[in-house]
Amino acid sequence: AALVTEHLQFSLPYRALFSRHVTPDTVSRLLDALAVLLVRLHLLGLYWGDVSLSNTLFRRDAGAYSAYLVDAETGELRPKLSRGQREYDLDLARTNIIGELMDLQAGGFLGEDEDVIAIGDRIVERYNELWKELTEPELIPSDERWRVQERIDRLRELGFSVGELTMDSEPGGERFIIQPKVVDAGHYHRQVMRLTGIDAEEYQARRMLDDLEQYRAVHGLWDESTQVVAHRWMTDVFEPIVRAVPAELSAKLDPPQIFHEVLEHRWYMAQERGQDVPLDEVIESYLEKVLPQKRDE
């Protein structure tokens, strides 16, 4: 028997990201991405059983990373995971990650002064923060119902959509208990896919939507539907950037990441000059000075 899986374009194993000396900030962003992945899997009822950096692929996602499970040989799909199963998976993740970071230290890819135990603890902290935000009930006073929307907005900031929310009142009706019931990852990704057909990671998609709204404001398109604005934005902003990338540089980064980096480059150029810089000039500068220095991903 043979199992054929789809190739995940522009993805990297963690050792490729550590092929040069990296900063603790990069390590933290990788662990944040892995924590999000683990929470998503546990919400689906998947016990991984072998959580590690080695069994994960990473894709650049604007200034962050997105993580993908690539080895599910030890995984078990259940209707719902117990707290003990989740905690075992999480403890295994911490143990494996600390060991992998020690290997990187021994190879000179991570500074000897870095506390790998503390870095490994980060995935536990981040996981618990996310799990609490996504699943735990919250008590709110009956006259502060606006906090329901605040909870939903916080979940969206984390990249999750709330499909259903339960709300019950305490005896006496002075406080409500709210709890997310159906939570789906990829809130901004789905919006961008629906509006443009672009398959972007979550933070990339969020950056695109922010730029789309800025485009609406600059061109005074308040009366136009979001679909119309998105079409014009694609034609005037996104597509010119992607088309400008020569074939020999197209394997460096995926189009949504290139778009994000062009926006970053535009910001730095504007800061340096103290004024706005035309997009054509920004693209030319980025393709000449920045993208050629990237490795093929």
Model-based region annotation:
Residues 1-31:
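Conserved structural core of kinase catalytic domains
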Residues 22-24, 76-80, 104-109, 252:
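Short, polar/flexible loop-turn hinges at active-site or ligand-entry regions and domain interfaces
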Residues 47, 53-103:
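Catalytic activation segment of kinase domains across protein kinase-like and atypical kinase folds
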Residues 101-297:
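Regulatory N- and C-terminal appendages and interdomain linkers associated
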Residues 20-49, 53-54, 90, 94:
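Conserved kinase catalytic-core helix
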